[in-house]
């Protein structure tokens, strides 16, 4: 099994407002990228458990969740992001692998997008999505 890289950032901003739910306006983001359809444990158990442990307010899937070369990677990515959507809102944006699939296999790409949407994932295409968490407004 490939290793997962964990990186933690603490970002402070005066733009954040105190909220009812969290001390000091804490907002926890969980970001995934470049999984290329790989699984980390059965049904991506390692990623799902890591996300649950972090208790994120928002999950960002920053592209390259699938592999242009492996069609079976589509189902892996849809299953993972749909499962994570049960934990917190998930926003997805294309990476270069998704763009290649869109260009060369448009039907496959559309099926992938539909799978994400059915799984409760917010798919972003050059747009902004806004949500509110415990009084804290967030624009992605």
Label each PLM-derived region with a short phrase.
Residues 1-83:
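N-terminal active-site segment of His-dependent metallophosphoesterases
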Residues 8, 30, 52, 92, ...:
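Phenylalanine-focused residue identity feature
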Residues 21, 42-45, 58-61, 75, ...:
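Generic marker of "main functional regions" within proteins
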Residues 23, 84-86, 117, 133-134:
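Short, structurally constrained coil/turn elements
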Residues 30-33, 58-64, 89-96, 122-127:
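Active-site neighborhood of phospho(di)ester-bond hydrolases with catalytic His/Asp-centered motifs
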Residues 35-37, 67, 98-140:
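Conserved catalytic scaffold of divalent metal-dependent phosphoesterases
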Residues 53-55, 87, 118:
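Alpha-helix C-terminal capping/helix-to-coil transition sites in glycosyltransferase folds
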